[in-house]
Amino acid sequence: MKYIPLAVVLSTCGLLSVTCQLVINVSSGEADANVYRQSVTGNMTSETVNVEFLTPSGQAVLQVADFRSGVTITSITIPGEQELGEARYQVLCFVSPGTGDMIPPEAVTKLRQKHPGAVRVAEESRGRVVMDNSATLIVNKAQYLSSHIPHICKEAKETTFVPEHLITQYKDGTIGSKKINVRKEASYFSISTSSQYSQLKRCAQMSYNDLEPCLCVVDACVHWYPCSLKYCRNNSGDTGEHRCGIRTCSKCTEMRFTARSKHVCSWDEL
């Protein structure tokens, strides 16, 4: 296992805090895997759990589980290939329905580390899922879906994507910002591109001279997150239980979306 020197791991959590940030060393567990630093932050006021890290390949990932709106926002900052004439970086944003199996913010604020310098490997793999993001969001109007989107995705005004079934769930009222009394029609903040999306060729199959839109794929892998709470029987002789720990998981999501050309999806491979 390759080890990248890291700063001392910290946990900034008060006993009565509404916000807690746990900073840990993470590895995928593979023999040649790099170790990197990751923060997990629970905020009871905003009802969010943030997972943030910089991958060994230089991608900055922020995943926000918004329990109030019932969505997860994933921001990925990808460095550009300067020798190919690409921009220094580009930001992609994806909004998915649900908060997955992330434990709630209140539970995250109670997390502590016994061994801060340890390298964390998830106990369980939740596998790999494919997310077809065939619609785009108008970022400065997307507060009706989640109040956090305009801020998190502010650098992805043309590259914020959602799956069609998220739009359906918003229309059904199962997800969406609870702070705003008036619900806008989904068409106010989203644009469906499903007819074009189904006809796209993979960017990996295109040449750099091709300028038409193509289907791009980027992986969003979280190799360590608290996915459930553990309960133990009380020692006092009664039949009750108490929280006594967490179970940790890893999960990868293959984000598929429309890129305007191969030039903004140079990493795509088959």
Language-model region placement:
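Cleavable N-terminal signal peptides of Sec/SRP-targeted secreted and luminal proteins
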Residues: 3-21
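Intrinsically disordered, low-complexity segments enriched in small/polar residues
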Residues: 12, 27, 40, 125, ...
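Extracellular/luminal recognition modules and glycoprotein regions
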Residues: 18-63, 67
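An acidic-aromatic
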Residues: 52-112
